[in-house]
Amino acid sequence: MADVPKREIENVEFVFEVMGSAGEGIDAVDLGDALRALNLNPTLALIEKMGGTKKRNEKKIKMDEFLPIYSQVKKEKEQGCYEDFIECLKLYDKEENGTMMLAELQHALLALGESLDDEQVETLFADCMDPEDDEGLIPYSQFIQRLMSDPVVFD
């Protein structure tokens, strides 16, 4: 694929190998996780458009199908960036000091937009979250930095 540099192709192949099953490819239900492991932030609608499924074992995606999907998703403009996420979380920053209630972040992740489940939120917090202070507040900018620098892969 001419528009994907060799180093990126190696990363794509590595993620594909880790997430796939011996020679069969990756399950289409894991397409979003594979793309996120490659530092992309596709929406659920985009994942579905690219061939992702909601049920396991409906479809397998082979490497020769995955690379063009990766390339296309990489070009998509509707991906959140650091500044977008910070602006969103500022809405919960009542003191305007870079902190928000951990419970509010948890509620937002569980209930709003493309929501996560309890297990995914626990994994996300374990990998990216500083401990909350005595008042239940967390610094949200460090959370977003960690989240975007080291993608979390859900089992």
Swiss-Prot record:
One of its GO terms (cellular component) is muscle myosin complex. PROSITE patterns: EF_HAND_2 (PS50222). Coiled coil: none annotated. The keyword Repeat applies. Keywords: Motor protein, Muscle protein, Myosin, Repeat. The keyword Repeat applies. Residues 7-41, 80-115 form the EF-hand domain. Gene3D superfamilies: EF-hand (1.10.238.10). PANTHER family: MYOSIN LIGHT CHAIN 1, 3, MYOSIN LIGHT CHAIN ALKALI. This is Myosin light chain alkali. It comes from Drosophila pseudoobscura pseudoobscura (Fruit fly).
